[in-house]
Structure formats: C-alpha cells, structure tokens
Regions:
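Glycoside hydrolase catalytic-domain context in secreted enzymes
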Residues: 1-149
Length: 149
C-alpha cells in the first residue's frame, strides 16, 4: 500500500513539472543515532519489507531523484553499497534518476562513486582530492594496460 500511495504522489507532483526526491533509501527506521545504526536484515526481509515500496515507486512513477540513508545495512554504508545503489536500484529496477547522499553520509567518496552516487553533499576538499587521486591512478592503470606494461 505504501508503494502505491507514494507512486501516486510522485506521479501527481511530477505531472505538474516538479521533480521529486524519495528518501531515505533504505532501512531507515529511526532518526536517533541514524548515523551509527547498522540494520541487520535477511535478503528476504530486505526485499519484501524494506525495498518493496521503493521498487514500486521507481518502476511505476520514475522519480527524478532518490536520497540514500545514513545507516548501514548488514555492515555496509548505504551510500557506499554498490549492491544496493548500483545493482538493485539502477541495474535491476532501471532507476535512471539522480542518486544523492544525505548530508555528510559518504565516508568513502570513491566507493560512493562506484555505487553510482551522483551527488555527494558536501564534497569536502579532502574528498575532492581523494577522488582526484583515485582518478589519476585509474588513468595510469588504463594507460599501462593500453601499452601492454
């Protein structure tokens, strides 16, 4: 029911030319200690309880954006979990909108980028430098591979 209601709201709002942002993806159960919570959940419960509503909205209403939660799921930061943001959200469900992290949620900007986090807030100078260094290393590796060394 939640997914149906949310899909109807997203569709109605976006029909008027206004983008929507679903939050807090996923397993966000509490605002207290939200940056330290590690939700332990089985794959079945994750899919049938925590992700089902989001999946319904993504497939039915195509929201413009989605915000990840602060918490961890089974030890993985949601904002850096490739399986949740890339494999399930983008690849399996076909989400083609913008994925944004909650303010300061990204601990590892490279992993977040691999997981298809499109907007990291805020992007600190140290995070930008870290990303630049990682990109430099990838370019060097690609160059070496292309020349066969």
């Amino acid at each position: 029911i939640t997914g149906e209601m949310a899909a109807a709201i997203v569709s109605s709002v976006q029909h008027e030319g206004v983008g929507t942002c679903m939050k807090h993806f996923a397993c966000h159960n509490s605002d207290s200690r939200r940056t330290r919570v590690n939700v332990h959940v089985s794959e079945r419960a994750l899919r049938e309880i925590y992700l089902a509503g989001y999946e319904r909205v993504v497939r039915k209403a195509h929201p413009v954006s989605l915000m990840t939660a602060y918490n961890k799921i089974n030890g993985e930061e949601v904002s850096g979990d490739n399986r949740i943001t890339r494999d399930i959200l983008k690849n399996e469900w076909g989400f083609d909108g913008t994925v944004v992290c909650d303010w300061g949620a990204v601990k590892d900007p490279v992993e977040a980028s691999k997981g298809r986090i499109d907007l990291q807030m805020p992007l600190s100078k140290s995070s930008a430098a870290y990303l630049e260094q990682a990109l430099d290393q990838l370019c060097i590796q690609a160059f070496r591979h292309s020349i066969g060394t």
